[in-house]
Amino acid sequence: GRRGVTTRVISGIDIALWDIKGKVANLPVYKLLGGFTNKVDTYIASGYYEKGKGLKELAKEMEDNVHMGAKSVKIKVGALSINEDIERVKVCREVIGNDVKLMVDANNAYRHYQAIEFARKAEKYDLFWFEEPVEPDDYIGQAEITRSTSIPIAAGENEYTRYGFRDMINHRAVDILQPDCLILGGVTEFMKVCALAQSNDLDIAPHGAQEVHIHLVSAIPNGLILEYYRDTVNPMHGKIWENELILKDGYVYAPD
């Protein structure tokens, strides 16, 4: 069938083929793809809802992120009431200060009018973006949110193929694209999405899979920032990769 598992399988095969090509050429994939830069702005994905985790614990987590070198951090919203989540945003901004970028991710939790309410209340906290406010297929609702707030809207982790991203762009439903090459069709399709984004003056901030996406976002001129998960999110994740990515002064460097 279309999309779903089929496209994810294609993604895995395509990624493996690019890995083989890099090994044969004795070059890192980011250089095979153009090698625009060897370091990328990076944010730590954090601020998850957890049992027993209140505002005090959230504040401590943000402090830890900054101490380990983060210049940008992201937290979850959408599981609590709008006012409760605004309080979470406020606490994070107070802890990290004004020089650290702050993003929020709703994981499709809101209806469009709820997302607009949240965004308007959150604007004073200078958010770098508001991620996935509504269901992935609600291009019309998301476009209305985009028009209703000064906060850039980011989305795309649940989108498949360049045609899905084309539809999102044509609806003016997004300001920052978040493709995931493990989902949308692999490295080859990811690069086509990046070219499409560039032709529409949009930046790329890939979703997850930092060990893969460091190569892709390093290869393009419109790569905005890389998502980075600490070991506390999944202690086993970093152990399956030969090259551990280290966050330093807000950047991650592409491995050679």
For each of these PLM feature ranges, what is it?
Residues 9, 14-17, 189, 208-212:
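Catalytic-loop motifs flanking and including active-site residues across diverse enzymes
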Residues 34, 47, 158, 209, ...:
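Residues that form or immediately flank small-molecule/cofactor binding pockets and catalytic motifs
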Residues 205-256:
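Flexible C-terminal active-site loop/helix
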Residues 19-23, 195-198, 215-218:
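Short glycine/serine- and small hydrophobic-enriched flexible loop segments
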Residues 75-207:
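Catalytic core of soluble alpha/beta enzymes
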Residues 1-102, 107-109, 113-124, 237-256:
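N-terminal capping/lid subdomain adjacent to the active-site entrance of alpha/beta enzymes
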